[in-house]
């Protein structure tokens, strides 16, 4: 089973929101977020996992890229 999550930084915490499942979690760091997300998904899909089905998490993130003008040599 493939479950998609959007991750984003809300200014204080890293957050993960399920796009296919009613799951939300957060962490102070990306590592903490990933650990919390794994635990939340395992609990949410406990019956699925107990039936021997595998769970795959697809993590989606948006990154802003701004144009930085090249340094003009004088």
Regions found by a protein language model. Give the residues of each.
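A short, exposed loop/beta-hairpin motif centered on an aromatic-Gly-Thr core
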Residues: 21-31
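Short acidic, gly/pro-rich beta-turn/loop elements at beta-sheet edges
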Residues: 15-17, 26, 35
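Short, charged, surface-exposed hinge/linker loops at domain edges
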Residues: 1-6, 31-74
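Generic structural signal for short, solvent-exposed loop/turn connectors between secondary structure elements
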Residues: 1, 20-21
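Short aromatic-glycine-(Arg/Gly/Cys) micro-motifs in beta-strand/loop hairpins
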Residues: 8-20
């Amino acid at each position: 089973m493939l479950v998609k999550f959007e991750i984003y930084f809300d200014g204080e915490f890293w957050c993960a929101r399920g796009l296919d499942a009613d799951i939300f979690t957060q962490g102070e760091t990306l590592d903490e977020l990933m650990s919390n997300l794994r635990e939340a998904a395992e609990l949410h899909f406990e019956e699925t996992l107990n039936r021997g089905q595998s769970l795959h998490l697809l993590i989606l993130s948006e990154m802003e890229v701004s144009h930085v003008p090249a340094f003009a040599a004088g």
